[in-house]
């Protein structure tokens, strides 16, 4: 009988110690934050569904504000934004140079001649482009032989052939050296060049009138100075 109350008291003490240990354990673990396993799982699952968008992949329109010009015409080429509209003109891709139409003559020295020549009866040039078909450039033969003479006819130029310095032909109607029936005769060779001119006297007209004081007298024709003939005229009686 004596062992039963002892045993009862021991069991009561054991139960009391057990409950007191549970109370102290709760107080001890209450100091640490509680982590619920169910809440962890829900948070991780929610993070998997979220999509992370970096800032670099965002559109530039959202990053920078759109610039609007103050003018109504806008900016860029021809008042439009670059790339918004094409220019109003079109450029030709192929370029063909201008070529003068020519025809070739293998027999002629200059074989490249334009088809259209300047011919309106004023200045027409022949195919060789040197000599005129119409007598525009008369050269040295402009007047008659007794006026402005050519180079081939040197009857009255500088030296007058066999007649010494002067030609003994009759010099026009006013020449009084030869009259009717040979009544009057004048020795032409007696004029021994006493005049200050170098080659011919004042009566003669040299080529181009280069050495006469009476220069360009009546367009180079052989008109004589009547005053000098009146002084030197001699009468001859047969």
Curated annotation (Swiss-Prot):
Family matches, as InterPro entries: Prot_E6-like (IPR040290)
Tissue note: It is predominantly expressed in fiber cells.
GO-annotated biological processes: seed trichome elongation
Places the protein is found: Secreted, Cell wall
Biased composition (Basic and acidic residues): 40-51
Coiled-coil ranges from the UniProt annotation: none
Record-annotated disulphide pairs: none
Biased amino acid composition, Acidic residues: 227-238
Keyword tRNA-binding: no
Annotated segments matching region Disordered: 40-64, 210-238
GO cellular component terms, A-Z: extracellular region
Protein keywords: Cell wall, Secreted
Protein name, as recorded: Protein E6
């Amino acid at each position: 009988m004596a062992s039963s109350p002892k045993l009862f008291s021991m069991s009561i003490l054991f139960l009391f110690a057990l409950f007191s240990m549970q109370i102290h354990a709760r107080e001890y673990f209450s100091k640490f934050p509680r982590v619920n396993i169910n809440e962890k799982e829900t948070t991780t699952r929610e993070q998997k569904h979220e999509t992370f968008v970096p800032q670099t992949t965002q559109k530039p329109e959202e990053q920078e504000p759109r610039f609007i010009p103050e003018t109504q015409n806008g900016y860029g080429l021809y008042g439009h934004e670059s790339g918004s509209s094409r220019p109003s003109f079109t450029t030709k891709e192929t370029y063909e140079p201008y070529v003068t139409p020519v025809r070739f003559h293998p027999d002629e020295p200059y074989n490249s001649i334009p088809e259209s020549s300047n011919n309106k009866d004023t200045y027409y040039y022949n195919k060789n482009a040197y000599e005129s078909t119409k007598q525009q450039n008369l050269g040295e033969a402009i007047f008659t032989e007794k006026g402005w003479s050519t180079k081939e006819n040197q009857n009255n130029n500088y030296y007058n052939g066999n007649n010494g310095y002067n030609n003994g032909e009759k010099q026009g109607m006013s020449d009084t050296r030869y009259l009717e029936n040979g009544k009057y005769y004048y020795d032409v060779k007696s004029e021994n060049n006493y005049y200050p001119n170098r080659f011919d006297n004042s009566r003669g007209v040299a080529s181009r009138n280069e050495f006469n004081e009476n220069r360009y007298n009546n367009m180079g024709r052989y008109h004589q100075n009547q005053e000098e003939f009146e002084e030197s005229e001699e009468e001859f009686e047969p």
